[in-house]
Amino acid sequence: MFTHITVGANDIEASRKFYDAALGALGHEPGQGPDPKGRYWWRTRMGAFAIGKPIDGEPACHANGGTIGFGAKSAEMVQAFYDAGVAAGGKAIEDPPGERTGPFGTLNLAYLRDPSGNKVCALYRVG
């Protein structure tokens, strides 16, 4: 469905370190960049995720009610995402990492805010 998602970052280096750590815990390589517009990219064959300063020159701000979810291959990877993200400047939010059961079955989730306030999570579908 998506080709890429880009979020704004006020401190590119702090955000790059956060995503290198958190996405690295999910098995991704460090971000590539900066590109000519100062963005860093994490790519998979399914799509890409990027951070950068807003092109309009205004400060980056997070989406109130928005979340970007990254897939994990195990509950251990979800916990590793959380631990690495917190150690790299992310802020713990919502419930602690763990299982939640709802209309989509049982999920293992961990939620963080990146250094610019963007809400991200790691998700593993249990069973």
Kindly label every feature range from the protein language model.
Residues 9-14, 70-116:
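Vicinal oxygen chelate
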Residues 41-46, 112-115, 125:
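Active-site beta-strand termini and strand-to-loop segments that position acidic
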Residues 7-49:
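Core segments of cupin and vicinal oxygen chelate
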Residues 40-80, 86:
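Long, continuous compositionally biased terminal/linker segments
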Residues 27-32, 98-101, 123-127:
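Conserved catalytic-core motifs of GNAT/GCN5-like acyltransferases
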Residues 1-16, 68, 123-127:
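N-terminal beta-strand motif that seeds the catalytic metal site of vicinal oxygen chelate
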Residues 49-53, 111, 120-123:
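Conserved beta-strand in the GNAT
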Residues 38-40, 66, 106-110:
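Short beta-strand micro-motifs in enzyme catalytic cores
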